[in-house]
Amino acid sequence: MKIIDALFAPGLTGFYFDDQEAIKKGAVHNGFWYEGNPQTPGYKRIRQKGEAILVMLVLENGEVAYGDCAAVQYSGTGGRDPLFTAEEFLPILENEIRPKLIGLELNSFRNLAHIFDRELTVNGKPLHTALRYGLTQALLDGVARAQKKLMAEVIAEEYQLPVIPEPVPIFVQTGDDLYTNADKAIIKRADVLPHALINNVEEKLGRQGEKLLAYIKWLKKRIFELAGDEYRPVIHIDVYGTVGLIFANDLEKIAGYLATLAHEAAPFKLRIEGPVDMGSLWGQIEALSKLREIIDRRGIPVEIVADEWCNTLEDIKLFADHKAGHMVQIKTPDLGGINNVVEAVLYAKMKGIGAYLGGTCNETDRSAQISVHLALATRPDQMLAKPGMGLDEGLMIVYNEMQRAIALLKRRGGK
């Protein structure tokens, strides 16, 4: 089955592009807006609409394969590729990429993904991560349609993985609405919750960590109030390095605080994402490796999750090699081609470290659906409900696609 045409259209994501540098320097909120001047090249405002480019591959039989190019909320910052806008990148797709797609035989996802993710260059440079992300999604969908298979089945077959028609735990994020959205997550029986966005010491963590401790107390009580004794979600809190700030990155003290949180969270399993941010890749790897060692030695029932400085496939491999944490987040758009997402999950599992197939609130419904198929094939420990920050919408998109795929896999005899 060949591609006979390729179409591209501007789209919207589930959230916004935010200039992280300007926000760190004290940009002031005005409603949902930020006042002030952008600090990162490419930004015209501190907060801009989240943009996507919608990829449509027309196949010989008239079917259309879909994928969406998208970037993370903090596009253009933290060493990432430049800010991703449709205006800038649509011409590249139309003029440089479209001719290379037309006439391609859709016979192997891995081979095609390798070409567009790792070999193809424009003006001597690799394609933007967002372009590689969306193009490889569409290519996977195209191969699946050509073979009359689910995308999960294509990944399983090409990477020699078993087809297991069972759900992968879904992790929801509350955003700043810590209480109402936690209620929503509990009512809908989310597998992992609430993320909680603990990104500020004064407002959210507390100078002694007392505000987060109080929130976990409230959350545990609320789970029992709304759901009774049968519901046992994992409590997963992202602290954005703030715990390290209040303890001056003293790992023994941090471990002691995490032990207090774990005691309060019991009987629920506790994960803490990003306990420290050491400001560099190797500093982060060393700190999380030591912190994991302390936690394991002391028998503290908490798992730490690597996020900061763990961005590319190469980064993820380094964190896994050095056991820098109990789990690594795989931020799907930052990896470029979804072939790298598959490799990242499989590498983490091979190394005995937890795999969290994450991403960003700033993706699309389509990229989230395709992430579901990657998760069903590779079996990470959890995946993110995305896109958006409203909780309900992202959970609906991911949960429903997962249930559809599982039902079809069962019908086809997946075991």
From Swiss-Prot:
Single GO MF descriptor: methylaspartate ammonia-lyase activity
Residues reported in the UniProt entry to bind (2S,3S)-3-methyl-L-aspartate: 173, 329, 360-361
Pathway per the UniProt entry: Amino-acid degradation; L-glutamate degradation via mesaconate pathway; acetate and pyruvate from L-glutamate: step 2/4
Name of the top EC class for this enzyme: lyase
Binding site for Mg(2+): 238, 273, 307
EC number: 4.3.1.2
Site feature Transition state stabilizer, where: 195
Keywords: Lyase, Magnesium, Metal-binding
Subunit structure: Homodimer.
Family (UniProt): Belongs to the methylaspartate ammonia-lyase family.
Protein name: Methylaspartate ammonia-lyase 2
Annotated organism of origin: Carboxydothermus hydrogenoformans (strain ATCC BAA-161 / DSM 6008 / Z-2901)
